[in-house]
């Protein structure tokens, strides 16, 4: 059976700066929300930071970004399009970060402080890796 193809759209590689700018804005929002102990906002901003950072990386290096209905599909696209010694580790990290999105948005309880702080560390590490490759 052939591997599932991830839906994606083509973009001019110079457009990566738009997505990096969004990632940095979401990162700042995550930090600000964390300082105010707004854990739901901090968590969701962190997830969106990584989505935009992934878009920046894929657009710059491959001229594409995911257009799938599932954010998790970006993990497969990242593995298929980015060549780096840390890709497996960082793709796993991205998958774990993205898995938090539904918990933060749709579960009928607040995102716990402990989870938000752990997520913040993962986001910082993932964004650092992305910026190194840009």
Residue ranges and their predicted role:
Residues 1-134:
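Terminal alpha-helical segments
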């Amino acid at each position: 059976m052939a591997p599932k193809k991830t839906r994606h759209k083509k973009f001019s590689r110079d457009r990566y700066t738009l997505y990096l700018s969004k990632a940095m804005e979401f990162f700042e929002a995550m930090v600000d929300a964390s300082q105010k102990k707004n854990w739901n906002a901090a968590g969701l901003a962190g997830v969106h930071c990584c989505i935009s950072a992934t878009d920046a990386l894929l657009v710059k290096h491959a001229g594409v970004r995911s257009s799938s209905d599932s954010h998790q599909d970006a993990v497969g696209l990242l593995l298929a399009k980015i060549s780096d010694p840390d890709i497996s580790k960082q793709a796993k990290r991205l998958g774990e970060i993205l898995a938090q999105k539904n918990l933060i948005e749709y579960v009928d309880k607040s995102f716990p402080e402990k989870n938000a702080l752990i997520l913040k560390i993962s986001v910082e590490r993932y964004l650092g890796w992305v910026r190194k490759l840009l």
